[in-house]
C-alpha cells in the first residue's frame, strides 16, 4: 500500500487528499490532508468519493482513428500526430490560419492550458477558448476594468478575519463547503453574515441577514447602497483619493438611485438597506463574495463592478479580511483565465502591451511576432462559426460532421 498526495478535481477550492493505493492500482482509502493549508484536514462529500473515479486501463492507451466504415481502430501516437498535423496544415493552407480552433476547459492543468495556447495560438495562429469564458467572463471583465488585471484579491484565510461577510448570488454551504468551513472557523463573536439572493438558500438560512431581492434587481440595490454610503459619509476618502480614479463620476451616477424608490424596484425595504449600509460602515474588515448568481445574471458585469466599487470606496480591499471576491467554479478556471493565451498574454496582460509582449517572448524563447496581436474569437463564435445559420436546436453531432477535422 502506498500513499499518493494529489488535488481534488471537482471544484476551484483545490483540496488536497492522501490516496491510499494498493498494489493493483486501486484506491482503497481517501483521506483529506491535514497539513495542507487549503482544506486543513477537511473535505466535502464529493472529495470523499474520489475513489469512485478509479479507471484501470488493461491495455496501453492509444489514439483511435475512425475508419471509412465508421468504426474506430487503434493507431500509434507517432501516426496520430502525423495525421493530425497533416490535416491541420491542409486546412489552414486552404482556408487560412484562423480556420483552426481549439476548445478547452477549466479541468485542465495550467501547464496543459499553456501548451495548448502556445501551439494553437502562437505557432498555428488559430483561435482557442475555454468554457471558463462562459461562466467567468463577468468577473474577468469587471476585474480588468477596475484593476487592469484579472486576479481575485483574496485568500481563504480572509474569511477567518472578516467581521462582515456579504455573499451575493452564491450558496457556499452547498457549492463551496470548504470555503464555508472558513466562515465557521471565524472566531469573531460579533461577525455578520449577509446573503443577497432571491432564493432562501442553505447559506441564507444560516445568515444573520437575508436580503431576498427581486430577480434582476441586484444592480439597483447595489447602486442605491453605494449612494447611501456616500451621502452619509461612510466612505474612506483617503483611500479614494490615493488609490482610485474618477470617484466623482461614480458618485454622480449613483445619485440617480434614491433610497425612497428602492423597495419598488428590489422588494427590499428602505430600513433594511439603511441597516445594511450601517453594518458595512461599522465593519472594520468587510468582504464581499459573489459567484454564478451574479456572473450569469442581469447586467452581470455592471453588477460585479458595483460590488468592487463598494469595496473600493469603503477602503475594504488590500487588507486581511476584506476584498471584492469572485469565487470560481471549475477546479482550474483561474488557470484557464491566466495561462491559456486566449484572451490575454500568459500570466496576465494585454496583447497590445509592448513591454509585456517582449518579456513573454524572451521567456518562451520565440519571435515576438508569433504572439497573437488580438484576443481569440470567443467560445460561442467558434461554435457558431461551424454553422452560420446555427439555431438553438442544432445538435452538436450535426455541427461536428461539418468540420474538416474534429
Regions found by a protein language model. Name each.
Residues 80-100, 155-163, 253, 274-287, ...:
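Glycine-rich phosphate/diphosphate-binding loops that line cofactor/substrate pockets in enzymes
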Residues 281-403:
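A glycine-rich, hydrophobic/aromatic-adjacent loop/helix-cap motif
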Residues 163-188, 290-291, 374, 386-394, ...:
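Glycine-rich anion-binding loop/nest that anchors nucleotide
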Residues 95-99, 235-240, 287, 318-325:
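Flexible, glycine/charged-enriched surface loops at secondary-structure junctions
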Amino acid at each position: 500500500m502506498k500513499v499518493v498526495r494529489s488535488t481534488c478535481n471537482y471544484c476551484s477550492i483545490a483540496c488536497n487528499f492522501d490516496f491510499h493505493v494498493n498494489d493493483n492500482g486501486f484506491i482503497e482509502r481517501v483521506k483529506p490532508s491535514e497539513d495542507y493549508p487549503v482544506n486543513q484536514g477537511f473535505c466535502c462529500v464529493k472529495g470523499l468519493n474520489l475513489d469512485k473515479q478509479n479507471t484501470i486501463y488493461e491495455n496501453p492507451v492509444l489514439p483511435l482513428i475512425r475508419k471509412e466504415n465508421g468504426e474506430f481502430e487503434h493507431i500509434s501516437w507517432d501516426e496520430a500526430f502525423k495525421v493530425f498535423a497533416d490535416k491541420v496544415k491542409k486546412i489552414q493552407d486552404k482556408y487560412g490560419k484562423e480556420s483552426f480552433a481549439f476548445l478547452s476547459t477549466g479541468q485542465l492543468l495550467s501547464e496543459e492550458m499553456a501548451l495548448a495556447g502556445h501551439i494553437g495560438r502562437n505557432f498555428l495562429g488559430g483561435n482557442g477558448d475555454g468554457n471558463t469564458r462562459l461562466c467567468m467572463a463577468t468577473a474577468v471583465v469587471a476585474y480588468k476594468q477596475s484593476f487592469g488585471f484579472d486576479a481575485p484579491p483574496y485568500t481563504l484565510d480572509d474569511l477567518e478575519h472578516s467581521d462582515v461577510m456579504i455573499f451575493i448570488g452564491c450558496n457556499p454551504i452547498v457549492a463551496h463547503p470548504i470555503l464555508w468551513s472558513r466562515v465557521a472557523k471565524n472566531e469573531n463573536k460579533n461577525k455578520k453574515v449577509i446573503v443577497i439572493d432571491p432564493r432562501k438558500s442553505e447559506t441564507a438560512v444560516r445568515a444573520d441577514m437575508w436580503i431576498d431581492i427581486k430577480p434582476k434587481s441586484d444592480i439597483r440595490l447595489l447602486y442605491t447602497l453605494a449612494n447611501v454610503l456616500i451621502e452619509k459619509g461612510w466612505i474612506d476618502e483617503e483611500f479614494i483619493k490615493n488609490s482610485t480614479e474618477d470617484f466623482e463620476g461614480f458618485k454622480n451616477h449613483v445619485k440617480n438611485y434614491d433610497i425612497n424608490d428602492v423597495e419598488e424596484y428590489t422588494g427590499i425595504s428602505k430600513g433594511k438597506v439603511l441597516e445594511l449600509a450601517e453594518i458595512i460602515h461599522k465593519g472594520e474588515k468587510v468582504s464581499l463574495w459573489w459567484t454564478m448568481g451574479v456572473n450569469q445574471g442581469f447586467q452581470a458585469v455592471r453588477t460585479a463592478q458595483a460590488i468592487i466599487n463598494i469595496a473600493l470606496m469603503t477602503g475594504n480591499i488590500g487588507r486581511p479580511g476584506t476584498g471584492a471576491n469572485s469565487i470560481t467554479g471549475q477546479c482550474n478556471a483561474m488557470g484557464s483565465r491566466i495561462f491559456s493565451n486566449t484572451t490575454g498574454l500568459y500570466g496576465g496582460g494585454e496583447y497590445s502591451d509592448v513591454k509585456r509582449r517582449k518579456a513573454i517572448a524572451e521567456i518562451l524563447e520565440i519571435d515576438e511576432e508569433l504572439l497573437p496581436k488580438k484576443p481569440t474569437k470567443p467560445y460561442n463564435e467558434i461554435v457558431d462559426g461551424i454553422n452560420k445559420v446555427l439555431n438553438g436546436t442544432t445538435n452538436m453531432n450535426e455541427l461536428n460532421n461539418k468540420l474538416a477535422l474534429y
